[in-house]
């Protein structure tokens, strides 16, 4: 059964209940927004949208970090992972927020220091802070990439 939401990139659309994610603590800087829909831009695209179901103007472009950083391993204490009901990062859907500068999309960056982990069973997510010092809030995707962005 679908739920109708208003989105920033696509206007009004139907999403399935399995696309609605709960973030009990919100996202960093947006703690008041707790529900987001994970929307695929196009089937063949690596990009997805994390769209607030509570605020139409709040949407983030996200991708799995493994697409441009094969050995991506955020360092997050196990006790924090238990907060979303997982024991290991590999049990989650891992995404990072992408910033695409309008003037030069080839300069897009990803926040590898603030990964979003989602429990695939419960659909509860959280944005964590990776303790891995090699991660950055503005990692250039194309410099790290072994990806072909469609």
Swiss-Prot record:
The keyword ATP-binding does not apply. InterPro entries: Flagellar_assembly_factor_FliW (IPR003775), Flagellar_assmbl_FliW_dom_sf (IPR024046). Keywords: Bacterial flagellum biogenesis, Chaperone, Cytoplasm, Translation regulation. Pfam families: FliW (PF02623). GO terms for biological process: bacterial-type flagellum assembly; regulation of translation. It is found in: Cytoplasm. The keyword Chaperone applies. Acts as an anti-CsrA protein, binds CsrA and prevents it from repressing translation of its target genes, one of which is flagellin. Binds to flagellin and participates in the assembly of the flagellum. NCBIfam families: PRK13285.1-1 (NF009793). Interacts with translational regulator CsrA and flagellin(s). This is Flagellar assembly factor FliW. The lineage of its organism: Bacteria, Pseudomonadati, Spirochaetota, Spirochaetia, Leptospirales.
């Amino acid at each position: 059964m679908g739920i109708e939401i208003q989105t920033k990139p696509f206007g009004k659309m139907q999403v399935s209940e399995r696309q609605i994610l709960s973030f009990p603590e919100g996202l960093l800087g947006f703690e008041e927004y707790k529900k987001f829909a994970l929307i695929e831009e196009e089937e063949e695209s690596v990009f997805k949208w994390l769209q607030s179901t509570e605020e139409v103007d709040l949407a983030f472009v996200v991708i799995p970090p493994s697409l441009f950083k094969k050995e991506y391993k955020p360092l997050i204490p196990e006790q924090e992972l238990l907060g979303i009901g997982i024991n290991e990062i590999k049990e989650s859907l891992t995404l990072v927020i992408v910033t695409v500068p309008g003037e030069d999309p080839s300069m897009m960056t990803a926040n590898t220091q603030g990964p979003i982990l989602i429990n695939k069973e419960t659909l509860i997510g959280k944005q964590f802070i990776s303790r891995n010092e090699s991660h950055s809030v503005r990692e250039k995707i194309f410099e790290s990439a072994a990806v072909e962005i469609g």
